[in-house]
Amino acid sequence: MTRSSIELGDVTPHNIKQLKKLNTVVFPVSYNDKFYVDVLEAGELAKLAYYNDIVVGAVCCRIDNTENQRRLYIMTLGCLSPYRRLGIGTVMFEHIMNFAEKDGNFDSIFLHVQINNNGAIEFYKKFGFEIVDTKEQYYKRIEPADAHVLQKTLRRTAPNSNSTATSTTANSNSRSKARQFTFV
């Protein structure tokens, strides 16, 4: 399989049922109607992954403005098991990284992973994520109920490291355009 056979598409009212079905198959938790309403409004932060015009995966994220930080939260990123290890997850993750890079104002990207999901943990570690916390009893109605919090810290640097004037400009549009974005 080549990456050219993998395409990402928008989540729309016409295909939201495919996302619901996919999530039911891929994830051990069920998502409520509000989740899907939010996904429909997420734009570039929610994508279906197609392989030969068949929905085989999806990624859904949201912006989290808590803990005095602006972070990107990966709510779901999953692929049907027959299509795993073919680069589909990587394409979805790279889409999210590109979004974060273009935005230029995220402190980190984070997500929760069930503590026994070694495949997912290794997938994210491959992209520089680290386990930063473990939440006991995070999940309801599934075992194990504990979840690791995985995080990738993002660092923004001004083009001229000898001057901080660029990063303190009052106009946020010029500020974000003036920064270079690097991943730690």
From Swiss-Prot:
UniProt: CoA binding residues: 117-126
Subunit structure: Component of an acetyltransferase complex, at least composed of san, Ard1 and Nat1.
Family statement drawn from the similarity comment of this UniProt entry: Belongs to the acetyltransferase family.
Residues bearing the modification N6-acetyllysine: 47
Outcome of mutating residue 84 to A: Abolishes N-alpha-acetyltransferase activity; impaired sister chromatid cohesion during mitosis
Post-translational modification: Autoacetylated.
A Gene Ontology biological process term: mitotic sister chromatid cohesion
RNA-binding in keyword set: no
Protein name: Probable N-acetyltransferase san
Bias-annotated ranges (Low complexity): 157-174
Keyword match Transferase: yes
Organism: Drosophila melanogaster (Fruit fly)
Domain N-acetyltransferase, residue spans: 6-155
Gene field: san
Top-level division of the source organism's lineage: Eukaryota
Enzymatic reactions: N-terminal L-methionyl-L-alanyl-[protein] + acetyl-CoA = N-terminal N(alpha)-acetyl-L-methionyl-L-alanyl-[protein] + CoA + H(+); N-terminal L-methionyl-L-seryl-[protein] + acetyl-CoA = N-terminal N(alpha)-acetyl-L-methionyl-L-seryl-[protein] + CoA + H(+); N-terminal L-methionyl-L-valyl-[protein] + acetyl-CoA = N-terminal N(alpha)-acetyl-L-methionyl-L-valyl-[protein] + CoA + H(+); N-terminal L-methionyl-L-threonyl-[protein] + acetyl-CoA = N-terminal N(alpha)-acetyl-L-methionyl-L-threonyl-[protein] + CoA + H(+)
Catalytic site positions: 73, 112
GO CC annotations, alphabetized: cytoplasm; cytosol; NatA complex; protein acetyltransferase complex
Subcellular location: Cytoplasm
Chain's role: N-alpha-acetyltransferase that acetylates the N-terminus of proteins that retain their initiating methionine. Has a broad substrate specificity: able to acetylate the initiator methionine of most peptides. Also displays N-epsilon-acetyltransferase activity by mediating acetylation of the side chain of specific lysines on proteins. Autoacetylates. Required for the establishment of sister chromatid cohesion and couple the processes of cohesion and DNA replication to ensure that only sister chromatids become paired together. (Microbial infection) Required for optimal replication of E.chaffeensis in the immune tissues, hemocytes, and fat body.
Keyword set, alphabetical order: Acetylation, Acyltransferase, Cell cycle, Cytoplasm, Transferase
Entry GO MF terms: N-acetyltransferase activity; protein N-terminal-methionine acetyltransferase activity; protein-N-terminal amino-acid acetyltransferase activity
Mutant phenotype after disruption: Flies display disrupt centromeric sister chromatid cohesion very early in division. This failure of sister chromatid cohesion does not require separase and is correlated with a failure of the cohesin component Scc1 to accumulate in centromeric regions. In contrast, no mitotic defects are observed in germ line cells during oogenesis.
Segments of this protein annotated with the region Substrate: 138-141
